[in-house]
């Protein structure tokens, strides 16, 4: 498929007229010559939003089977892009080919997961409370509930996952599954990859006969184009993965609208790892090497990167640090996604190293180019950590901080001082269970996913996954951005009272022609 640098607005390919952008190859440290990508003008934003608004009712009225087939068609079209997609993503991100192949599998897998969710119909949460005309002292009306899509959704592609959290990523897949048209703001770090995937979606739209306005792809600076999209009255929700600053800027814009809308922003997390005494004594070396592998995976560019380690002071922790430092020293520097991310990592690492009481205990191989970064491991005492809020700030990249605590009570105090997190990990053995049980209440308050004897950098796409957490991990701790229940972000309930049966949505009619799971008087039918 030939790249053109055009945006996709409904069924049309449009050359942006408000400026130009070029893709960048971080491995070579130079721009990619062709194509040049045109930036959206305000008229392009208006057109995409109007098309999405006009497509909403027609799209959500599609049979569930047709909606599911559309999602599967998107997956098929992405696979059909073949090596061209992987090659372009590799050029734009520096990510290894094997990693990108795996990410493509994850991307099409979650599209097919949501197709299954749509076909099953359980997401509609259909519930029926039949009329009770003879009830005293007052009769009860016939009441039936079903969820419907919110309306057009704006999705911001993430820098660190050019496929799985981008144009056809989890936000787009779950919004389309909910019956919502999607407008994607392409991330500037992978413009060509975004165009390829956008064209795959557009091909699926045409093949399945969906309304043209169900999908658009715009290009431009996030602050300008993003602000215009979130402000537009047709837009009813936002999906975002990125920095705390960027996410909160969108939240403020959304809240300032005459009609505020939800922004589901995944932002900042340092993902604490607690090393319990028995586990540290029995297998500290293995934990240390596994931790370093997780820390440096993808040059640390995961929102679930283990950026904080808590442990009780003693010889076993000394050995853990020694082994971790030795393992880190063998790790080569890697190419980060963009020059800006690499610069921010160096800046954040420098600030962390200058905080009171910090000691560097290990480092990976030094960077050889401006877009490369090496790992770093630091140590600080719990009292110093508690005295300085800046220790809780995320350093996006392969850097982590070990906090030495006097006892479990001090571990608990450090955990209490943390902001909300995506994950918290417990490295423990059977003898550690009483200590782990004492920390569970605070861990449950702080994080969306709790792990035992694993590492947080893997996020499975499945029904039970939670990729979310209290602020600032996300802007809304009640939902997840990964897994089947991510669809809940883009739905709202509607109650139908005393409706004629043939005027009800099919899922609420007495004969249940969709054969979806339902509750009747609070019990499964």
From Swiss-Prot:
Record SUPFAM superfamilies: ALDH-like
Enzyme class (EC, first level): oxidoreductase
InterPro entries xrefs: Ald_DH/histidinol_DH, Ald_DH_C, Ald_DH_N, Aldehyde_DH_dom, Aldehyde_DH_Superfamily, ALDH_KGSADH
Protein residues bound to NAD(+): 185, 188, 242-247, 394
Enzyme active site: 266, 303
Inducing stimuli: Induced by D-glucarate and D-galactarate.
Keywords of the record: NAD, NADP, Oxidoreductase
EC number, as in UniProt: 1.2.1.26
Gene Ontology BP, a term: galactarate catabolic process
Reactions accelerated catalytically: 2,5-dioxopentanoate + NADP(+) + H2O = 2-oxoglutarate + NADPH + 2 H(+); 2,5-dioxopentanoate + NAD(+) + H2O = 2-oxoglutarate + NADH + 2 H(+)
Pathway assignment: Carbohydrate acid metabolism; D-glucarate degradation; Carbohydrate acid metabolism; galactarate degradation
GO molecular function terms noted in the UniProt entry: 2,5-dioxovalerate dehydrogenase (NADP+) activity
Pfam families: Aldedh
PANTHER family hit by this protein: ALDEHYDE DEHYDROGENASE-RELATED, SUCCINATE-SEMIALDEHYDE DEHYDROGENASE, MITOCHONDRIAL
Subunit structure: Homodimer.
Job of this protein: Catalyzes the NAD(P)(+)-dependent oxidation of alpha-ketoglutaric semialdehyde (alphaKGSA) to alpha-ketoglutarate. Involved in D-glucarate/D-galactarate metabolism. Prefers NAD(+) to NADP(+) as a cosubstrate.
Protein family per UniProt: Belongs to the aldehyde dehydrogenase family.
Protein's UniProt name: Alpha-ketoglutaric semialdehyde dehydrogenase 2
Organism (species): Azospirillum brasilense
């Amino acid at each position: 498929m030939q790249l053109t640098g055009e945006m996709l607005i409904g069924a049309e390919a449009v050359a942006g007229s408000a400026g130009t952008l070029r893709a960048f190859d971080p491995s070579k440290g130079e721009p990619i010559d062709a194509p040049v990508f045109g930036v959206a003008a305000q008229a392009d934003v208006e057109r995409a939003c109007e098309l999405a608004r006009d497509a909403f009712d027609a799209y959500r009225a599609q049979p569930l089977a047709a909606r599911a087939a559309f999602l599967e068609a998107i997956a098929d079209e992405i696979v059909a892009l073949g090596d061209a997609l992987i090659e372009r993503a590799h050029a734009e991100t520096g990510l290894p080919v094997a990693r990108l192949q795996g990410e493509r599998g994850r991307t099409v897998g979650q599209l097919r997961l949501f197709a299954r969710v749509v076909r099953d119909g359980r997401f509609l949460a259909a519930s029926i409370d039949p009329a009770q005309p003879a009830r005293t002292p007052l009769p009860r009306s016939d009441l039936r509930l079903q969820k419907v899509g919110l309306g057009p959704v704006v999705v911001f592609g993430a820098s660190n996952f050019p496929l799985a959290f981008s144009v056809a990523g989890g936000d787009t897949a779950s919004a389309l599954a909910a019956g919502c048209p999607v407008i994607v703001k392409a991330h500037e770090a992978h413009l060509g990859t975004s165009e390829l995937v956008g064209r795959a979606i557009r091909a699926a739209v045409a093949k399945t006969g969906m309304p043209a306005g169900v999908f658009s792809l715009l290009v431009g600076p996030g602050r300008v184009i993003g602000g215009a999209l979130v402000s537009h009255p047709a837009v009813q929700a936002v999906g975002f993965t990125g920095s705390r600053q960027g996410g909160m800027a969108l939240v403020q814009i959304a809240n300032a609208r005459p009609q505020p809308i939800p922004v589901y922003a995944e932002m900042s997390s340092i993902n604490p790892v607690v090393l319990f005494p028995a586990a540290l004594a029995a297998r500290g070396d293995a934990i240390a090497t596994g931790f370093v592998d997780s820390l440096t995976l993808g040059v640390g560019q995961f929102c679930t990167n283990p950026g904080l380690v808590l442990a009780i002071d003693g010889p076993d922790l000394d050995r853990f640090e020694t082994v971790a430092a030795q393992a880190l020293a063998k790790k080569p520097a890697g190419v980060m996604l963009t020059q800006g991310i690499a610069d921010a990592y160096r800046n954040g690492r420098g600030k962390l190293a200058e905080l009171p009481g910090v000691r560097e205990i290990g480092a990976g191989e030094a960077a050889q180019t401006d877009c490369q970064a090496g790992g770093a491991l630091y140590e600080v005492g719990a009292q110093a950590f508690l005295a300085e809020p800046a220790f809780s700030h995320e350093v996006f990249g392969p850097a982590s901080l070990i906090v030495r605590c006097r006892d479990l009570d001090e571990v608990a105090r450090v955990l209490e001082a943390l902001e909300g997190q995506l994950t918290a990990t417990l490295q423990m053995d059977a003898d550690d269970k009483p200590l782990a049980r004492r920390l569970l209440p605070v861990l449950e308050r702080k994080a969306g996913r709790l792990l035992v004897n694993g590492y947080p950098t893997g996020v499975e796409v499945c029904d039970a996954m939670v990729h979310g957490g209290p602020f600032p991990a996300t802007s809304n701790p009640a939902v997840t951005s990964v897994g089947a229940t991510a669809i809940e972000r883009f739905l709202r309930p509607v109650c139908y009272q005393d409706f004629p049966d043939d005027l009800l949505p099919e899922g609420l009619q007495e004969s249940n022609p969709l054969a979806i799971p339902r509750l009747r008087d609070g019990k499964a039918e």
